[in-house]
Amino acid sequence: RKGQPRDLQPPGSYWEYNDVRVNLLSLCLLHTFKSPLPEVLKERIMGPIGASDTWEWMGYKNSFVEVDGRQMQSVPGGTHWGGGIHINTYDHARFGLLIHRDGMWNEQSILPEGWVRQLRAPSDIRPGYGFLWWLNTGGEEWPGTPENSYAAVGAGSNIIWIDPDNDLIVVARWMDQAAVAEFLAKVTQAV
């Protein structure tokens, strides 16, 4: 159905994976912080977790907006080919560890209390999806893995998979989407 027109539905009655809501969230965050989001990410998250200086978050050349008289690039929320975050595996894993630790790093709260709990909560209309994270609700997303596992999945199946039962963060890069469930089941069997 992607790219095909559909009738608008009442909020909470229809679910479709797309980048529209993420891009709107990015624009809202620009207006909230009044700073480019890559700067906010570096200052509030990547710096405190000790990420390298090699990551970058890129927008499109035609994605500038004015916020309080200042031109800022409205970073795409989704990972479109050519835009989004470019990050190494080490930094990916550190971010996963921050999420696994409920937003805490070195006994410092990096994310608002309760945020990670909310992102792991199944949505009513799509129980396998929380706040931008895929959930293994009922073991349906990745059979053979813990039902409380969850993952961030980006373009090219770049994955941060978190298994709270085994205190495990797995980062997989450029994996065939069809192979992800089997791969994660094998990881689970190995621990």
Specify the residue positions occupied by each region the protein language model found.
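Generic alpha-helical structural context detector
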Residues: 94-97, 117, 121, 185
